[in-house]
Amino acid sequence: MQSKISRLLTNASELCEDRKYAKALKYYDKVLQIEPDNLKANVDKGVTLQNLGCISKAIQMYEKALILEPENLDALINMGSALHTLEKYTEAISCYNIALKLDKKNSMALVYKGLSVGETGNISKAIKYFKKALSIDCNYDLAQISLESAKNIINSK
C-alpha cells in the first residue's frame, strides 16, 4: 500500500511541476482516500489549492496537517503565506513566529515574515528580516529582491 501511495504522490508532484494542478489534486485525493492522515498529501494538496487560487481550501488543508503535526514547518510557512494572500498579516506573522521558534534560521520564514511585517507598514523592521535571511542564505533571491524593494520604498519617502 505504501508503494501505491508513494507512486500517487510522485505523480501528483510531477503534475505540479508541470503546472497541471487540477490533475494533481486528483492524485492527492486518491492518497487521502487511502490514508486521510497522510501529512505530505495534506500539505501538498494545500499548496496545490493555493496555486489554483483556492486560498480558503488551502488553509483547511494546512489546518488539518497542523492537527496531525503541530510543528510541521512546511504547513506553518504555507499557512502563513495563504493568510498573507488574504491580507491577514497578523495571523500570517503568528505562523512565521511559530516556525521561527522551531527553526530560528529558516530563511523562508524570515523573508515571508518580513513581507507580512512590511505590509503592516513597518518597512524598517521588514528590512531587518530580509537582511537576517540573507545572512543565512546569501543567494536567496526573494530576500534580495524584497530587501531592494523595501529600501526603495524608504528612499522614496
Residue ranges of model-derived segments:
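Alpha-helical segment of the N-proximal tetratricopeptide repeat
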Residues: 3-40, 47-51
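Helix-start (N-cap) detector for alpha-helical repeat units in TPR-like alpha-solenoids
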Residues: 5-6, 39-40, 73-74, 107-108, ...
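Register position in tetratricopeptide repeats
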Residues: 17-18, 51-52, 85-86, 119, ...
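Canonical positions in the second alpha-helix
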Residues: 31, 64-65, 98-99, 132-133
